[in-house]
């Protein structure tokens, strides 16, 4: 097939990130310079973000049988690129004290970003699998990048082994779906699947295995066991990427699959997803109550947040509000997570020391760093879904969608989960304003707000507050980000 200029423009973000990978690789071969390679990475991701404007002017289209570029893919590509940009920026300070080769970290981030962009545009089960592998394989290396530290190496081994098992489930599930339908394209599956076919045991087994594989990647109960350990063991910038870019990209492709293929018309699939959502909301929040490590708290809370999002996934075919709900919620979750992990990253010393991830490290922080404490407070309020933050707008959408779709018990679980969540978010906030311990030494620089990581954290907190007070620009953007049906 011949590729037209319009198709090349549609692929611009992917091509620019791919070109950045090549440039950074050549630069490493020529001369190792941490500052130059990190700058090239940030420039490449910014150019990819700018190229989205040209893609918008180009209009929606099917670029290849595997990829469909439309408003939906552009919105989620933008979110993935923002998460990657924040990860690269936060990683610079952490890598400054790293004794080994630092530059390869940026290559891994860029390759994983390509996987995220591919997932946002995927319109085919082959593209779904390629995208998931392209985002997962670099993450194995990123999670274990601090391999001299036992916990990082342990987290990497856990994630690699469980991820390989989940990928085999996903692939076998796809094979069963293909055996029953003879189709791999999302749109073709939508035309082929009907109510009688959705009762076939082979097809249900295939869909079940796909749910297992995707549930692992999204850390949904009961496939969540790796999440707190990996979040705690991985370097903070990697935990940031894992919690944001990876989850957003995979949820976007699952939304598109469920939107095109009428999978949720099957009562069995709906019931299974509803049980997973219910368990994720309650289990994620209840387990976070007993944690004294902030990275583990954020890990368990991410399980609960993905549980809330499943409400949108269950009714995505029946309700036009579902796409809007998921878009607003994921944007709020992205900025709140970037801010929260950003504060942990700024508080942690460079590679040489331990991450400042125990709640004890944050006790009395307000009396030393009032602005940083205020930022973390805003992020916790947003994650808890308190009014005047972007997190509240997302939570409000989820509850409204649940009520409109007559999902009474799931809506009740969202409210109950949010109430439980408020307790452990408040615990973190209260510790910031207690009297500081005498013998606690903090390594962070006094001018943190002027560092690149500080700018990321401040921008995230401003967006959480401004869009929480006036969410209309985000809602308009999400309404424009509608897939071709």
From Swiss-Prot:
GO cellular component: plasma membrane
Top-level taxon of the source organism: Bacteria
Keyword list, A-Z: Cell inner membrane, Cell membrane, Membrane, NAD, Quinone, Translocase, Transmembrane, Transmembrane helix, Transport, Ubiquinone
Predominant location: membrane
Gene Ontology MF annotations: NADH dehydrogenase (ubiquinone) activity; NADH:ubiquinone reductase (non-electrogenic) activity; quinone binding
Enzyme Commission no: 7.1.1.-
Its membrane topology: Multi-pass membrane protein
Class of enzymatic activity (EC top level): translocase
GO process annotations (BP): ATP synthesis coupled electron transport
Function recorded in the entry: NDH-1 shuttles electrons from NADH, via FMN and iron-sulfur (Fe-S) centers, to quinones in the respiratory chain. The immediate electron acceptor for the enzyme in this species is believed to be ubiquinone. Couples the redox reaction to proton translocation (for every two electrons transferred, four hydrogen ions are translocated across the cytoplasmic membrane), and thus conserves the redox energy in a proton gradient.
UniProt-recorded name of the protein: NADH-quinone oxidoreductase subunit N
Species for this entry: Sodalis glossinidius (strain morsitans)
């Amino acid at each position: 097939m011949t590729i037209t200029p319009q198709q090349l423009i549609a692929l611009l973000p992917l091509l620019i990130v791919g070109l950045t990978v090549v440039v950074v690789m050549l630069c490493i071969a020529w001369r190792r310079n941490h500052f130059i390679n990190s700058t090239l990475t940030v420039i490449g991701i910014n150019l990819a973000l700018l190229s989205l404007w040209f893609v918008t002017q180009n209009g929606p289209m099917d670029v290849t049988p595997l990829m469909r570029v439309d408003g939906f893919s552009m919105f989620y590509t933008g979110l993935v690129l923002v998460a990657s940009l924040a990860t690269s920026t936060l990683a610079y300070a952490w890598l400054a004290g790293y004794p080994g080769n630092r530059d390869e970290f940026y290559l891994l981030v860029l390759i994983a970003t390509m996987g995220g962009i591919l997932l946002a545009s995927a319109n085919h089960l082959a593209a779904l699998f390629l995208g998931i592998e392209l985002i997962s394989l670099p993450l194995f290396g990123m999670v274990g990048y601090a391999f001299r530290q036992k916990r990082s190496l342990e987290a990497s081994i856990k994630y690699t082994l469980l991820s390989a098992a989940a990928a085999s489930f996903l692939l076998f599930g796809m094979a069963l779906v293909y055996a029953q339908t003879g189709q791999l394209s999302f749109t073709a599956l939508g035309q082929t699947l009907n109510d009688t076919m959705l009762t076939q045991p082979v097809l249900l087994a295939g869909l079940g295995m796909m749910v297992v594989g995707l549930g692992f990647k999204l850390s949904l109960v009961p496939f969540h066991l790796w999440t707190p350990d990996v979040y705690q063991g991985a370097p903070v910038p990697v935990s940031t990427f894992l919690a944001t870019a990876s989850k957003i990209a995979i949820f976007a492709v699952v939304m598109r699959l469920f939107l095109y293929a009428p999978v949720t018309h099957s009562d069995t699939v709906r019931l299974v997803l509803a049980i997973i959502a219910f368990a994720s909301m309650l289990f994620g929040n209840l387990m976070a109550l007993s944690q004294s490590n902030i990275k583990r708290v954020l890990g368990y809370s991410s399980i609960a947040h993905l549980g809330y999002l499943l409400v949108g996934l269950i009714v995505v075919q029946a309700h036009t509000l579902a796409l809007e709900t998921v878009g607003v919620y994921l944007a709020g979750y992205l900025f709140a997570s970037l801010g929260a992990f950003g504060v942990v990253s700024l508080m942690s010393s460079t590679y040489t020391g331990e991450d400042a991830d125990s709640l004890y490290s944050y006790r009395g922080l307000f009396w030393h760093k009032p602005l940083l404490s205020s930022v973390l407070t805003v992020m916790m309020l947003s994650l808890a879904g308190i009014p005047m933050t972007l997190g509240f707008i997302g939570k409000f959408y989820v509850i409204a969608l649940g009520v409109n779709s007559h999902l009474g018990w799931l809506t009740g679980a969202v409210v109950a989960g949010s109430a439980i969540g408020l307790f452990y978010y408040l615990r973190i906030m209260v510790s910031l304003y207690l009297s500081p311990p005498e013998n606690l030494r903090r390594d962070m620089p006094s001018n943190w707000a002027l560092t690149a990581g500080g700018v990321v954290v401040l921008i995230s907190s401003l967006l959480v507050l401004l869009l929480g007070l006036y969410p209309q620009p985000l809602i308009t953007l999400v309404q424009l980000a509608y897939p071709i049906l």
